[in-house]
UniProtKB/Swiss-Prot annotation:
This is Putative ubiquitin-conjugating enzyme E2 D2-like protein. Pfam families: UQ_con. The gene is UBE2DNL. Belongs to the ubiquitin-conjugating enzyme family. Signal peptide: none annotated. It comes from the Eukaryota. Residues 1-75 form the UBC core domain. InterPro entries: UBQ-conjugat_E2_core, UBQ-conjugating_enzyme/RWD. It comes from Homo sapiens (Human).
Length: 75
């Protein structure tokens, strides 16, 4: 079930890419994705690379996200 949903979401991203970011599976593992924020230039997340690991029961449980660079937080 999770793979079917993730594949559907991947096809939607390919069909209608979102501005200022990219995302997709790492190699052929649909449960492991990499996402990158490319703009806007004044964003504290510019150039951010994120890895997402989807659980096999995705939709009922959220993906785990790993940030490879610092994340701005106001506190």
């Amino acid at each position: 079930m999770a793979l079917k949903l993730i594949h559907k979401e991947f096809l939607e991203l390919a069909r209608d890419p979102q501005p200022h970011c990219s995302a997709g599976p790492v190699w052929d593992d649909m449960l492991h994705w990499q996402a990158t924020i490319t703009r806007p230039n004044d964003s504290s997340y510019l150039g951010g690379v994120f890895f997402l690991k989807f659980p096999s029961d995705y939709l009922f449980k959220p993906p785990k996200i790993k940030f490879t660079n610092g994340i701005y937080h106001q506190r």
